[in-house]
Curated annotation (Swiss-Prot):
Substrate binds at residues 57-60, 113, 118-120, 124. The gene is hemA1. Its EC number is 1.2.1.70. This is Glutamyl-tRNA reductase 1. Catalyzes the NADPH-dependent reduction of glutamyl-tRNA(Glu) to glutamate 1-semialdehyde (GSA). Keywords: NADP, Oxidoreductase, Porphyrin biosynthesis. Homodimer. During catalysis, the active site Cys acts as a nucleophile attacking the alpha-carbonyl group of tRNA-bound glutamate with the formation of a thioester intermediate between enzyme and glutamate, and the concomitant release of tRNA(Glu). The thioester intermediate is finally reduced by direct hydride transfer from NADPH, to form the product GSA. It comes from Flavobacterium johnsoniae (strain ATCC 17061 / DSM 2064 / JCM 8514 / BCRC 14874 / CCUG 350202 / NBRC 14942 / NCIMB 11054 / UW101) (Cytophaga johnsonae). Possesses an unusual extended V-shaped dimeric structure with each monomer consisting of three distinct domains arranged along a curved 'spinal' alpha-helix. The N-terminal catalytic domain specifically recognizes the glutamate moiety of the substrate. The second domain is the NADPH-binding domain, and the third C-terminal domain is responsible for dimerization. Belongs to the glutamyl-tRNA reductase family. InterPro entries: 4pyrrol_synth_GluRdtase (IPR000343), 4pyrrol_synth_GluRdtase_dimer (IPR015896), 4pyrrol_synth_GluRdtase_N (IPR015895), GluRdtase_CS (IPR018214), GluRdtase_dimer_dom_sf (IPR036453), GluRdtase_N_sf (IPR036343), NAD(P)-bd_dom_sf (IPR036291), Shikm_DH/Glu-tRNA_Rdtase (IPR006151). It comes from the Bacteria. GO terms for biological process: protoporphyrinogen IX biosynthetic process from glutamate.
Amino acid sequence: MENNNVPKHLYFYSVGLSYKKADAEVRGQFSLDAVAKTRLLEQAKNDGIESLLVTSTCNRTEIYGFAEHPFQLIKLICDNSNGSVDAFQKVGFVYKNQEAINHMFRVGTGLDSQILGDFEIISQIKTSFTHSKSMGLANAFMERLVNAVIQASKRIKTETEISSGATSVSFASVQYILKNVEDISNKNILLFGTGKIGRNTCENLVKHTKNEHITLINRTKDKAEKLAGKLNLIVKDYSELHLELQKADVVVVATGAQNPTVDKAILNLKKPLLILDLSIPKNVNENVEELEGVTLIHMDYLSQLTDETLENRKLHIPAAEAIIEEIKEEFVTWMKGRKFAPTINALKEKLNAIKASELDFQSKKIADFNEEQAEIISNRIIQKITTHFANHLKDDDTMVDESIEWIEKVFKIKAS
């Protein structure tokens, strides 16, 4: 039988860094693309780690997993990114056991998002869990926890208004353009990159600017054509990027490249240019600001743009937290039961062995011994004894580890 219990010397950790302490440049150093994530999971498996989940988005890179010491997980991030241990120590965080559980709930439900109520992260957690599970790195604890977080996220989304109103990086970028670029409907807009943020930005641009001069460029042209077809936009080849940059009044860069793809060397400008870099790592070299007429805005600045919508969202935090507490309590109850279940089962086996021995002895000693009745009575007594122990271990005031150790010592049993 598979043993899903966490060995006592292992702890559940969440380690990583986020927008709270790490700026865009540092987050870029620690970002992990799909290949790096797979490599990290393979390394974890080779290191003997039994369960692990890794997420890497524009705003955070995090690992959730079991280890004897958090450095095992920190090393995995540093080994598979461009970040260093020294840099991590300055901006990173480490949460252990219940704090790590609390953190995943807050992240997955949008309460820890750079823009409050942004539920995009939950889809990342789902995808990351599926990836881990496919590689044999998701135990019962992790699966139950992720499902609990997904449940909390769904309930908060449907039962509160914490995600109401249009507030996202893509929406904020369009609002910035509308406020800072005159006659936007007649300007040339270039969108470079058609990932999730790029697509959302493009849809918002079409909706709010009424502009018919939006050009899309993507390294993979068919992705750009697919999006352009829906929105009736222009698509150009990646090889024409430098030419389109010259024509543009506004450029939105939302690529997933690991290094800058736009710098001053490819800009031959004859008019002012507004560049919005919505990428992590940054995909626009800051040297473009050395050119006259260029304004460079990064997503971190856009994320700080708060409005009435965001203030309204804050009113719904208590309701969201109440839902989290309810679901978290259910998870903790399950976790406690899972922790002591092997000990209770071992105790029941021990008592059954004592019963069998005693019934055998008495059946030989007593002439008219009624074994069937004795079996029924004994089983009821064993059930009552084990139930009493289980109820004690479920009690919030019980020190579970110490109680389990005491039970195993007194009855000379070993949970398997």
